[in-house]
Amino acid sequence: MKKLVRYIVVCILLSVLPLAAKADSLTYSDSVEISLLTCTPGNEVWAQYGHTAIRYNDIANGNDLVANYGVFSFEQPYFIPRFVLGMTDYRIGISTTEEMLFIYSYEGRGIIEQVLNLTKEEKYKVYLALKKNLLPENVVYRYNFFYDNCTTRAQHMLLDHLNGNTKYTSDNTKPLPSFREMIHEWNKNDAWTQFGEDILLGVTADLPVKTEEQKLFLPDNLRKYIEGAIHNGQPLVKQTSVLLQPSKSSEEASTFISPFQVAIAFAILAISILLIEYKKKMALWGWDILLMAVSGVIGLLLFVMIFSCHPSVSLNMIIFLFNPLALFLIPSVVKSIRRKQKHWWWTAWEVSIIIGFIGSFFQKIPVPILIVALFLLLNCVFHQWLIKNVYTATIENKAK
C-alpha cells in the first residue's frame, strides 16, 4: 500500500515538475556525464515502442537529471481532434533520475544506459543546447511520430553536437524496411493496435525508408545505431549498463477477440442475410443502413486524415472500400429500396471497392478489412441483380 501511495505521489510530481522545468535546472562542471537512456516497451499503446531520454549527471554538484521529450497531457484543449490532425504539442521535461527509475521500476519496464565518450567541449555544447531548449519559448514542439518524436529529439541533441568524425555501423546486406514493418515489430502480439495502424497508414508507409537515419524514430534502433559507433577513433559509447531489468513481459498475447475473428463473424452474418434476401428477392434496407453508416463513418475518418499533418496517412486506398459518401446517401438509397427503384450508388460503390482491391497491391490492407470489403462488394452486386431482375421486371409487368 505504501508503495502504491508513493507511486501516485511521484506520478503527480512527474506530471507537474516537467511542466515547470527551467533552464536553471541544469548545472555544469567538468564531472558531467551524458548518457542515452533507452526504455523497454510498456503495455499502453503509446508505450509499446519504448522510450528515449537523456541522462545529465553533474556528479560534482550532485545534480542527476533526466531530460525527457515525451511529455504530453490529455487535458490540452481539443487534444483528440488535434491528435487526429497531427497537431499535438509535446514538450521537454526535467525530472531526477531517481524519480524516473522509480516510475519505470513500478511499471516493470527496463532501462539501458549508454554513457557517451564526449570531450569537455562536446559536453558543454550539449549543456548549452539543453539550457536553450529549456527556455519557456523552446520547451514545446510539434510532435511527429516518424520524424520528430522523443527519440529523434534526443538523437539530434546528442549527435548533432559531436565534433570531428563519427562512423556508424549498419548492415548493408539487409534492405531498408518500411515504416509499417518497423512499427509492427513492436506490437506484433497486439492484433488490435496493428489493425488500427494498418487502417490509418497509407501507401507511403509501405515504401522502404531512404536512409539509416530514418529508422531512428524508434528507441531501440537509436540504441543499436550508436552502440558500435566510432567517434574520432574511439567508441562513442564508453560504458553500457542496465539500470533496470524489465520485470514484466510486454509481449503477452492479446486477450481480446481478434479483428480476423470479428471479420469472420461478420462474413457469416453477411452470407446469412444475403441468402435470405436472395430467397425473398428483396433487400433488407435496415441492413443496408447499417453497412452504409459504418462504412461512411470509417470513410469520413479517412477523409479527415487526408488533411492530417501525420506522415504516411494522406494517401490511403482503404477510403475506396469504405466510401465516405455512403453516410450522406443513406436517405435517398433507402427511399429507392423501399420504392423498388434503381439507384446509381450501387454501381458507384462497386467501382470504388474494386479500385480499393486494386490498391491492395500497393498498400498493405489488413485481411479483415478485405473480408468485410468483399461482402460489401457482394451486397452491391446483389442490389444490381435485384434492380435488373426484380425491380425492372415488376415495372415492366405493371406496364403491360
Which residues does each predicted region cover?
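Soluble non-transmembrane domains of integral membrane proteins
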Residues: 146-216, 220-223
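Membrane-proximal intrinsically disordered regions of secretory-pathway and membrane-system proteins
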Residues: 24-28, 240-246, 256, 387-400
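Active-site nucleophile-His-acid catalytic modules used for acyl/amide transfer and hydrolysis
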Residues: 100-176, 376, 380-383
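Generic detector of multi-pass transmembrane helix bundles and their immediately adjacent loops
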Residues: 274-278, 285, 289-400
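Glycine-rich catalytic cores of cysteine/serine-nucleophile enzymes that process amide/ester linkages
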Residues: 29-109
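Non-cytosolic juxtamembrane linkers/loops
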Residues: 189-289, 296, 306-309
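Bacterial Sec-dependent N-terminal signal peptides
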Residues: 1-25, 394-400
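The feature marks either
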Residues: 14, 18, 129-135, 163, ...
